[in-house]
Amino acid sequence: KRFIVTEEVYDEFTEKFVKAMADIKLGDPFAEDSDLGPMARADLRETLHDQVKDSVEKGATIRCGGEIPDMQGAYYPSTVLTDVAPGQPAYDDELFGPVASVIRAKDDDDAMRIANDSRYGLGGGIFSRNEDRAIELACNHFDTGMVRINGFGIAAPNMPFGGVKDSGFGREHGGFGMKEFVNVKAVFVY
């Protein structure tokens, strides 16, 4: 996932985020002391690792993780990349695995430009102390199907779920979602 962070808080955020990600314990998902289990398949892990390596070859920096561990199973550690830029898979593509791309933005407007500079648009999030500004950015500047402000979570059954651009067509869930699965018919009686 892409974490677009404004200049004003970038260094502090990145330092704390890298520490938190580095502290995630990889292991058996049934073990109580494990935080992160394996990926679904080894080929998916290989694809993810290739995307990380390609991003690094093109200028990204690994701040934690980024190496396939010597463990049985399709494990991949929580990984943070910085110095992420256009032309790198970590910027341009969806990375399906525990990899976070931290991207520096000058300000809110630059953050929105970067966020929208993607062929995908399923969802996004804005974390801000200024909730009114976050709502304004979400409603008027963020080109995604869903936006969460100051939080994250799974799909809510009463809210439409779906994206824009290459992230799908239509909606599921809620009233809008129900309309995706029915045909509207006009009946005229004279």
Regions found by a protein language model. Give the residues of each.
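Aldehyde/semialdehyde dehydrogenase
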Residues: 1-78, 109-145
